[in-house]
Structure formats: C-alpha cells, structure tokens
C-alpha cells in the first residue's frame, strides 16, 4: 500500500510539472515571491531560472501575449476583417485560452509560478 501511495505521489508531481503553463504579469512586481519557472522574462529580457517544464513567467513584457495587454476586451468575429485574438482590460486576472494565466496589473505580494497562481 505504501508503494502505491508513493507511486501516486510521484505521478502527481510529474504531471504537475508537465502541465505547467505561462504566467503574464502586465505590470511590476512589488514584494512578490521569486518566480518559480523555467524561464522568466522581465521587460523583454529572458532569464533561465528553473527546471524544464516549469513554464514561463513574463513580467512587464508586452510582447508576451500579442494583443492581451492592450485596451478593452474585444473579440473579433469571423467576418470582422481585423486580426484575430482578444484584448483584456487593465486589472483583468484570469486564464486565457491555452492555459496561460494573465494578471494584467501590478502584483503586490504575489506568489508567482509557471503553474499559474
């Protein structure tokens, strides 16, 4: 039974690493925990900080998710004639399509990881 529990615990840890996503913070971080991620991109500069599979954290990097950090929420339709995608307003926090987590404001005291918290 102990072996089964240990096997399950190892599986959960491996699965959580394999499903790590990206976190985008559209502002600055103040008193935040150090980012836990494979890569951290701050102001467009990339730093390799963690292990493979831990996701990527973007801080104050507008190119991280094209269109996500500009203006109000706007979704273009099939006949819209504009570029695809969606835009999210200042202050938006939540998951984007594909599992990326967007925190479109400054982070104060945030715990940041590529797992999306």
Swiss-Prot record:
Triggers of expression: By bacterial infection (at protein level). Detected within 24 hours of infection (at protein level).
Position of the signal peptide: 1-20
Disulphide bond pairs: 29-32, 107-110
Main location (coarse class): secreted
Tissue specificity: Hemolymph (at protein level).
Presence of keyword Transferase: no
Family annotation (InterPro entries): Bomanin
Record bears the keyword Aminoacyl-tRNA synthetase: no
Keyword set, alphabetical order: Disulfide bond, Immunity, Innate immunity, Secreted, Signal
Biological process, per Gene Ontology: antibacterial humoral response; defense response to Gram-positive bacterium; innate immune response; response to bacterium; response to mycotoxin
GO cellular component: extracellular region
One Pfam family this sequence matches: DIM
Superkingdom of source: Eukaryota
Cellular compartment(s): Secreted
Family statement drawn from the similarity comment of this UniProt entry: Belongs to the bomanin family.
Record's miscellaneous remark: Not induced after bacterial challenge in strains carrying a loss-of-function mutation for Toll. Constitutively expressed in Toll gain-of-function mutants.
Described purpose of this protein according to its UniProt entry: Secreted immune-induced peptide induced by Toll signaling. Has a role in resistance to bacterial and fungal infections.
Name of the protein this chain belongs to: Bomanin Bicipital 1
Native species: Drosophila melanogaster
């Amino acid at each position: 039974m102990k072996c089964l529990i240990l096997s399950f615990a190892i599986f959960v840890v491996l699965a959580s690493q394999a499903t790590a996503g990206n976190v985008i913070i559209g502002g600055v971080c103040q008193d935040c925990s150090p980012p836990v991620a494979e890569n951290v991109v701050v102001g467009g500069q990339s730093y390799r900080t963690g292990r493979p599979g831990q996701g990527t954290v973007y801080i104050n990097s507008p190119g991280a998710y094209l269109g996500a950090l500009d203006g109000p929420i706007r979704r273009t339709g099939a006949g819209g004639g504009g570029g695809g995608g969606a835009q999210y307003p200042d202050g938006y926090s939540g998951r984007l399509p594909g599992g990326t987590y967007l925190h479109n404001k400054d982070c104060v005291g945030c715990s940041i990881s590529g797992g999306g918290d």
